[in-house]
Amino acid sequence: MSVRKKVSTPSKTSYPYYILACVVMLCVGLGITYFFLQNNVASAQEYPVKGFDVSHHQGDIQWQSISPQEFKFVYLKATEGGDFKDRKFQDNWLKAREQGFLVGAYHFYRLCRDGQIQAQNFIETVPKKTDSLPPVIDLEYDSTCINTYTREQLLKEIQVMHDQLYQHYGLQPIFYTSKAFYNIVLVDEFKQTPLWIREYQGQPELKGNPKWTFWQHTSQGQIKGIPTLVDLNVFQGSEQDWISFLERQGLYQLPQNLPIK
């Protein structure tokens, strides 16, 4: 038989100390968070080639207020899953290109949906243009689907979409992903596919140390002309490395202002 112990409660005079301790712990926590965020900003500033990505969540963007010289690349959300189309994609696509931005499109991949259907949704939505950046497949952790399907099943469907986009656009697709998803699903696979890593609290280092191409280092960016906070990204390498990357995509010899299409 267990004995119910008497629970002691702090005296009234000790409450100020508890409050003080809580305040100190909160300040320490905030300080650590601030340190990591500032460290990320400092690290990202080492890379000269900057860009951003947007979707309908950013609302009406004043593209004429943003400089293509400051932001060398822009990615726009186009589709999600098998049938969702971003309502701002066409407008953003036309206006960003009109202002001379180098533009690409991305698809938010749904792990529980068929890869072929998702590829078709993207292909029906995103124009095939020789002056566009490679297509991006956004792969993110989904506990329900990851626990429903085996790693092999997930990789098979991702491969289907990857291959269909490669065949249609003639450019090697890029995988946008997090450390968690990469380390669980993608590690040691798709070794020729460029990686775009989301990492806000440290360096974009992955299991096996694969080279990354883009790094989304914050979701709290501010850009004049965009009414909300926005994701900011950098390209790994110098400006000459960026030119070499564009040359491999057949994109370097572009006019200053791209035609409206």
Predicted regions and their residues:
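Hydrophobic membrane-insertion alpha-helices, especially the h-region
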Residues: 17-35
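Sec/Tat-exported extracytoplasmic proteins
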Residues: 70, 78, 97-100, 126-130, ...
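Substrate-binding cleft of extracellular glycoside hydrolase catalytic domains
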Residues: 39, 44-61, 77-160, 166-171
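N-terminal Lys/Arg-rich, disordered targeting/topogenic segments
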Residues: 1-15
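Functionally critical loop-and-helix segments that line ligand-binding/catalytic clefts
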Residues: 2, 46-59, 190-191, 195-261
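Aromatic-lined carbohydrate-recognition surfaces of secreted/lumenal glycan-active proteins
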Residues: 170-183
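Glycine-rich, charge-decorated loop segments at or immediately adjacent to ligand/cofactor-binding or catalytic sites
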Residues: 115, 181-188
